[in-house]
């Protein structure tokens, strides 16, 4: 089966080049770094123990940063290679990784580029985060070092798909020395697919450290918005904005002192978002146009990476994007800042976190734009200020209770150290 995969990936090599070229044209690749997709780039510098961590996108990248930080505290001699796939994660990792770590884009999953990449780096331990499984890369890497799959999760859709290709799934995942899943539900799915070397430690995102905040910026922003109730729409997709933008006018009519801030999941969409605002008769300014919100505008759009923590710091309520159709994003980043958290009907990629925060009365789930509008108006009514405060306090308590998970992950990871 793996030989067939290698053969097909070799035949598809010309198509890979076309795909990368198209991604360049639409802004999903950085021309300065595109060579890394073909394993042309940096290489290992010394013989110190090297841990390779692969983080597909932004959420996984935050976990990778946390792992690098905590492992290096206990093992300062260890060095790290962190790979990712998306440009958004690349920008975050390139700016936030410490000097003991190097970031590189993951090469295309083709045996030629994979072997060059592994020969350049020769990792001593590989850690893959969550659910991105590149068959060729994993199979070749397992020949060189132990591999761990951490915070593993599987959506119901993926589970049904893998059941039809159970043998191939086993061929990939059995390359991992340990599989650490994030919930009992995920454990059952992996076991049913024939993977027995699994452990459920819970979701390591529970243990993610608080997002960094520029204190000078925070003071300036807080002073600027001191008389406003800030509502943050975080990590939004076009499908979220189709629902959010039409309710903003009504919300601002009902709640005079509220101010809306929107942070798209992909800031490169800023032009289309501004165009949609105009179509909805909304006045909006992007952060790239003005460092501070224009108070007479209907909303402020943050089109820069790495500033989520700053805006969680000033928000009273945060709606977490991707929760109408994309399966949801990380709720817990907002919980660290004691926000009242709201999310939509689709949390299929974060089922257990969603269930946990709802049971703890640390978040609110809505089903539609109308429900969202009604809930925001209700929470911002001065008569309901105590209820709003309870949600804010409960969100922080929830995330604080789960900090021990990281220590349990590190106990397993460090078993594979020399």
From Swiss-Prot:
UniProt main location, coarse: membrane
Keyword Repeat: no
Gene Ontology biological process: lipid A biosynthetic process; lipopolysaccharide core region biosynthetic process
Positions of CMP binding: 264-265, 305-307, 330-333
Name recorded for this polypeptide: 3-deoxy-D-manno-octulosonic acid transferase
Stated role: Involved in lipopolysaccharide (LPS) biosynthesis. Catalyzes the transfer of 3-deoxy-D-manno-octulosonate (Kdo) residue(s) from CMP-Kdo to lipid IV(A), the tetraacyldisaccharide-1,4'-bisphosphate precursor of lipid A.
Cellular component terms (Gene Ontology): plasma membrane
Family: Belongs to the glycosyltransferase group 1 family. Glycosyltransferase 30 subfamily.
Reactions it catalyzes: lipid IVA (E. coli) + CMP-3-deoxy-beta-D-manno-octulosonate = alpha-Kdo-(2->6)-lipid IVA (E. coli) + CMP + H(+)
Pfam families with a match to the protein in the record: Glycos_transf_N (PF04413)
């Amino acid at each position: 089966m793996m030989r067939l995969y290698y053969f097909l990936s070799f035949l598809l090599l010309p198509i890979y080049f076309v795909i990368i070229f198209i991604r360049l044209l639409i802004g999903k690749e950085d021309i300065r770094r595109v060579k890394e997709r073909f394993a042309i780039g940096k290489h290992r510098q010394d013989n110190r123990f090297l841990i390779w961590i692969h983080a597909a996108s932004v959420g996984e990248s935050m976990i990778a940063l946390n792992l690098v930080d905590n492992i290096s505290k206990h093992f300062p001699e260890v060095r790290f290679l962190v790979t990712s796939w998306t440009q958004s994660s690349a920008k975050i990792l390139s700016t936030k990784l410490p000097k003991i770590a190097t970031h590189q884009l993951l090469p295309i999953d083709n045996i030629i580029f994979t072997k060059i990449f592994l020969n350049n780096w020769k990792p001593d331990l590989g850690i893959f985060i969550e659910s991105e499984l590149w068959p060729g890369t994993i199979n070749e890497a397992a020949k060189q070092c132990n591999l761990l799959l951490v915070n593993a999760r599987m959506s119901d859709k993926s589970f049904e798909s893998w059941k039809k290709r159970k043998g191939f799934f086993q061929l990939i995942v059995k390359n991992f020395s340990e599989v650490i899943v994030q919930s009992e539900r995920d454990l059952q799915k992996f076991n049913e697919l024939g993977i027995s070397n699994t452990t459920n430690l819970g979701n390591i995102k529970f243990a993610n450290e608080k997002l960094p905040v520029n204190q000078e910026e925070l003071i300036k922003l807080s002073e600027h918005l001191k008389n406003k109730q800030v509502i943050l729409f975080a990590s939004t997709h076009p499908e979220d904005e189709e629902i959010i933008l039409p309710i903003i006018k009504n919300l601002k009519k009902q709640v005079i002192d509220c101010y809306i801030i929107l942070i798209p999941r992909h800031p490169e969409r800023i032009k289309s978002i501004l165009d949609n605002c105009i179509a909805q008769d909304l006045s909006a300014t992007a952060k790239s146009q003005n460092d501070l919100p224009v108070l007479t505008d209907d909303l402020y759009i943050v089109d820069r990476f790495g500033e989520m923590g700053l805006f969680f710091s000033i928000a009273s309520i945060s709606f977490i994007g991707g929760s109408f159709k994309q399966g949801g994003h990380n709720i817990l980043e907002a919980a660290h800042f004691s926000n009242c958290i709201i999310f939509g009907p689709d949390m299929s990629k974060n089922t257990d976190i969603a269930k946990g925060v709802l049971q703890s009365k640390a978040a609110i789930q809505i089903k539609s734009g109308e429900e969202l509008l009604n809930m925001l108006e209700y929470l911002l009514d001065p008569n309901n200020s105590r209820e709003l405060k309870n949600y804010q306090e409960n969100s922080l308590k929830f995330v604080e209770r789960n900090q021990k998970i990281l220590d349990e992950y590190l106990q397993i990871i460090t078993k594979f150290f020399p």
